[in-house]
Amino acid sequence: MAESGGSSGSSQSPERPSSLADRNGALKCTFSAAGHSTGLLQGLAALRAQGQLLDVVLTVNSEAFHAHKVVLAACSDYFRAMFTGGMREANQAVIQLQGVSARGLRHIIDFAYSAEVTLDLDCVQDVLGAAVFLQMLPVVELCEDFLKAAMSVETCLHIGQMATTFSLTSLRESVDAFTFRHFLQIAAEEDFLRLPLERLVFFLQSNRLQSCAEIDLFRAAVRWLQHDPARRARASLVLRHVRFPLMQPAELVDSVQTLDVMLDDALCRQYLLEAFSYHVLPCRQHDMQSPRTAVRSDVASLVAFGGTPYTDSDRAVSSKVFQLPEPGARHFRELTEMELGCSHAGVAVLDNFVYVAGGQHLQHRSGEGAVDACYRYDPQRNRWLRLRALRESRVQFQLTALGGLLYATGGRNRAGSLASVERYCPRRDSWDFACPLKRRTWGHAGAAAAGRLYISGGYGVSAEDKKALQCYDPAADRWEPRAPMREPRVLHAMLGAAGRIYALGGRMDHVDRCFDVLAVEYYVPDADQWTSVTPMRAGQSEAGCCLLERKIYIVGGYNWRLNNVTGIVQVYNTETDEWERDLHFPESFAGIACAAVLLPRSGHGR
């Protein structure tokens, strides 16, 4: 009973311990063997070397290559399509290949089993041709890398032919860049004489040629033409891309007009006549603009003219001209000098000629030092040409290019502030008066946009004039008011960029003190509306200003917080609305005049 009673009570079987998998079901790791890929390749290479499991023979010109289909298909899109795409070769043990060389195929198969390829200038064309044909992109890229590293004056044009043959864009661009840098050296090579016409024209017409005087380019082109008598008929097609007007007159007389190739071709004679006319009539050079008169440069430089240190002990102003070679540069260097020192002049650019007018040749705090001089700077020849003087002396005025003419607006001189506007015609080398401003104005800023001339701020007759915006219509010869700026400012900067007109910096007066204006705003002519953007970090009035690749550079000027001239160069990105890292001008000057100019990349004539 006791036993039966005991057996009828509840009993529990021993608890089964949970498995390791149950307790750690969430634990999962993936491991990789670092040397597996290398070992796999080595194993496949060993099978090939020992003749094991080989299932295909590729033949080229009676030379046979044994391989594994799976290896070829894994490496090459061409073989993958052949062996898996239902082609008849998929079931063939021996396949004859067309379109590749035996040497090229050998390198390709060796690469498939080793991931390595040995290249030299003798075999690379065969290897590259095979890699392109068999669609083995890694080998194509290795060949491109090798050819870029092997590029030299001697090999450049041959590599360029390969780039063209196999449609390798990146390699072609590298060849072009190298050729532009070393064109004259390459032109002395024998390969240059075999250059196709279209490639020669491509280089001669480009602005990217560096360190090349036009007379040397002409000699290279003539050498190419004289290599084959049949090319003489194409002389004008080639020489039309030589910029004869940029040569020195003596070069035209002594080295160009004496050659039969120039005298026998009617168009070549026209090119020569064009060049002589360009030199004889400098004031009409604007009417003769063509691709042959353009400076060989594809990047504009910031060029800064003159300025004053505002020292009490010395009234001298600077005659130095500095350049910032390109937008990415960090340092200015001296470019040339003006005939006389000048500050607070007007500067404008027409057809890449820089006009510098008015200003002062001695430091004055008022308009007493205003001058009427006007000069034109030719960056190609690094020469100054004195032009007809302004009708009125002007300082702290605006000089603006619009419609092929120059407009000098307002300013001041010994007699006081001015409302007059002068218009300069380069062809006639003369100034005449246009419609005057509504009121006397100096210390204003100006810019051209959409066929109109705009001036803003400055000292007028009332406090409101410091915010005023006036618009000049050259067709109607009339000034009209537009929406005023949000901030009053004088001695500020103004320029057009991407359909907007920016007003930057300057100062404002309060009782007997002056304050920096840090606010920046832009005007949209179609909307007649101003919009504020990120302010400047430091004050700059009486500063130079120009636009390079959508960035505004404000150069030097006067800082009223420091009560001194400054050498800072602030850079504003119009696309991102951000101020970038500051630059530093070589001098601390106010009254600098700035312009964006294409400077020749060669030292010829400089």
Swiss-Prot record:
Residues 156-257 form the BACK domain. Residues 54-121 form the BTB domain. InterPro entries: BACK, BTB-kelch_protein, BTB/POZ_dom, BTB_POZ_KLHL26, Kelch-typ_b-propeller, Kelch_1, SKP1/BTB/POZ_sf. Transmembrane segments: none annotated. Residues 1-20 are annotated as: Disordered. The modification N-acetylalanine is found at residue 2. Keywords: Acetylation, Kelch repeat, Phosphoprotein, Repeat. May play a role in endo(sarco)plasmic reticulum (ER/SR) mitochondrial signaling. May be part of the ubiquitin-proteasome system (UPS) and affect ubiquitination and degradation of target substrates in cardiomyocytes. It comes from the Eukaryota. The modification Phosphoserine is found at residue 430. Kelch repeats lie at residues 301-352, 353-404, 406-451, 452-499, 501-550, 552-599. It comes from Mus musculus. The keyword Phosphoprotein applies. This is Kelch-like protein 26. The gene is Klhl26. Residues 1-19 have a biased composition (Low complexity). SMART domains: BACK, BTB, Kelch.
